[in-house]
Amino acid sequence: MRTAMSCGGGLVQRLDFSSSEEEDGLSNGINEAPQKGSPVSSWRTNNCPFPITPQRNERGLSPTQELSPSSDYSPDPSDKGAGGECPGTPLHYSTWKKLKLCDTPYTPKSLLYKTLPSPGSRVHCRGQRLLRFVAGTGAETEDPTLVNVNPFTPQSYRQTHFQPNGKRKERPEDDCSSDSQMKFTDKEHPSVFQSKRFVLRETNMESRYKTEFLEIEKIGAGEFGSVFKCVKRLDGCFYVIKRSKKPLAGSTDEQLALREVYAHAVLGHHPHVVRYYSAWAEDDHMIIQNEYCNGGSLQDLIMENNKKGQFVPEQELKEILLQVSMGLKYIHGSGLVHMDIKPSNIFICRKQTEVGEDESDGEDDVSSASVLYKIGDLGHVTSILNPQVEEGDSRFLANEILQEDYRQLPKADIFALGLTIALAAGAAPLPCNEDGWHHIRKGNLPHIPQPLTPAFLALLKLLVHPDPATRPPAASLAKNSVLRRCVGKAAELQKQLNVEKFKTAMLERELQAAKLAQDECLDLPPVSGFSCRGRKRLVGAKNARSLSFTCGGY
């Protein structure tokens, strides 16, 4: 179809297209610009008395505005034609559409082609969007190597699992995972995650604490922050949420908060260490989700006993010392030191167990089966090989730590554990300084009002020995015969075994006697008054018969 409009002898516009040419428009140069001197370049004349429409490139429309026929366009009076005589006015919709098809032939085929992704582009998968939080849009979310390095991770583990193995690992083109997934190549890779400042910052997300947890009550407070008892809305279980009191980002307490998270993550799960579930930052505050211990802390138990004038019995003291030493054995075996062992950092978990009518439970069984003592508050944890000691409570601090002698750091936990057991046994509160403090550092236990067995008392004195080399390590303390409940159980079981063996022997004797009696009944002796030859047995010997030899005079 060819159409031409004449205006004063000049050619105004020319439409030259056909339906058969639409399909070939894409391959024949969609973006080819008209050459100078072509008929298209002579669409405008200077002697046209009618208003003409300027080219789209002179308006500066965006591609979206150009493709939309319904886009509003208000002509600018300052815009004029090529000769400056006729202001530009919009064409009719049908004429505009024809011109558009002529200039850029967007056929259904070409439009479909433009909607397809380019080979180098990547389609982001939106699957499982409801299970994700929208992270912040800062620069820290774009760098895949912007992560913290856990200082408590063993060096051998880092070398084994963090370094690339030489093989190229890249995400395939059709993978729908997040863009933050790292790519390792042979030539370039991060040097085992150089520690970067991906620390406590406010994130552009809704409060996770308010969204996922229902706060029940405040159960504790300290220098670091407050502790709340909460119920998780999803699983309905109780957890402890520890939240810092003040913003930690950029403060001196920031590393202490991160140190506790690092230690929890490395230690994992142990029955005598408070379990760690998660940690995150909100408004520059650190929030840690830990296991809820329904028995409170050992400090709460000591205060309750002091009000009642009671003491923790010796058998329970042994149980506390045994279980805490097992927790310290696990911590020290992981290359870490707690550095803040005290009654307020030992927590009690009481199991809800029911005892049947036929079952009997002694004190030993009750303490071991229904009560667990766990070590918590890992804010002062440090590494044995690379110690960065942050002194804890001075009342439980060993003298060598005060002298900055870190050669036997695990023995500082043993010293603090001995004083903790002394407090649980009823000792007076420990002094913070002066003569009383130095008196204990010379190897003297504080006065314990209740009587203790000599073996247990000697063990407590050994724990606070002034020479750290003399104090027993946690591994040997957990196997000590004074503490191991299995020693008493073994003696009791051996006694029961001896009783059962005696009963079995008596039954065997009775069984043999019964067998002999049965054999005697079967083998009867011969009847008197009768002679038998050749040890023949008389028939009818057991029958009582009447024999008559009377003669009737016949």
UniProtKB/Swiss-Prot annotation:
The gene is wee2-c. One of its GO terms (cellular component) is nucleus. InterPro entries: CC_SR_Kinase, Kinase-like_dom_sf, Prot_kinase_dom, Protein_kinase_ATP_BS, Ser/Thr_kinase_AS, Wee1-like_protein_kinase. This is Wee1-like protein kinase 2-C. One of its GO terms (molecular function) is non-membrane spanning protein tyrosine kinase activity. It comes from the Eukaryota. Pfam families: Pkinase (PF00069). Residues 1-86, 145-183 are annotated as: Disordered. Keywords: ATP-binding, Coiled coil, Kinase, Magnesium, Meiosis, Metal-binding, Nucleotide-binding, Nucleus, Transferase, Tyrosine-protein kinase. Residues 490-516 form a coiled coil. Protein tyrosine kinase that phosphorylates and inhibits cdk1 and acts as a regulator of meiosis in oocytes. Required to ensure the meiotic cell cycle in oocytes by phosphorylating cdk1 at 'Tyr-15', leading to inhibit cdk1 activity and prevent meiosis. Its EC number is 2.7.10.2. One of its GO terms (biological process) is mitotic cell cycle. It catalyses: L-tyrosyl-[protein] + ATP = O-phospho-L-tyrosyl-[protein] + ADP + H(+). Residues 38-48, 147-163 have a biased composition (Polar residues). The active site is at D340. Disulfide bonds: none annotated. It is found in: Nucleus. Residues 213-487 form the Protein kinase domain. It comes from Xenopus laevis (African clawed frog). PANTHER family: EUKARYOTIC TRANSLATION INITIATION FACTOR 2-ALPHA KINASE EIF2-ALPHA KINASE -RELATED, WEE1-LIKE PROTEIN KINASE 2. Mg(2+) binds at N345, D377. ATP binds at I219, G220, A221, G222, E223, F224, G225, S226, V227, K242. Belongs to the protein kinase superfamily. Ser/Thr protein kinase family. WEE1 subfamily.
